[in-house]
Amino acid sequence: EFLQVIQNRRTIYELSKKPILADDALVQYIRQLVKEAPSSFNVQSSRVVVLLGDQHSKYWNEIVPRAVSASVSDEALETMRPKLQNFAKAYGTILFFEDEKLIKTQQEQFPMFASGFPTWSLHASGMAQIYTWTGLEAVGYGANLQHYGNLTGEMLKKEYSLPESYRIQSEMVSVS
């Protein structure tokens, strides 16, 4: 059964806003999936912010284009705009972060392993992402993974009053 769910998990770009779970249930489900993902020394440094409704639309229609425009020409942004607008048609976006404060604490607590914690944090983030993607597939959602966070990370911290120690890893666009 698990193997079948993994085999069914694919990148889905045909986007819709059709809900499968109630918003509260979906957010709780995603948080539980991330919590169950293994992490080195059980650090549990992965964090998610789930954007639904207007916040999801704002991310793809305002925040990402504003961030991209600071890095590319207007012409390049206009070429990208249809892709970003397509992501806005999805049901929601899951922002994956790693909490660097927890990683630093582990480095201080276990100095002999200090150099490994940043890498292990990335492993944990990847596991949280695949657990989430596979878990969404299991209940009928599709998804695709995006990487605009290197451009939007600081804006997101301000927009959602996130801790300075949060480092964005990816965005998962979820569809039904």
Predicted regions and their residues:
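N-terminal amphipathic, basic helical "cap/leader" segment at the start of enzyme domains
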Residues: 1-92
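Short, conserved acidic/polar surface loops in the N-terminal third of protein domains
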Residues: 60-62, 104-109
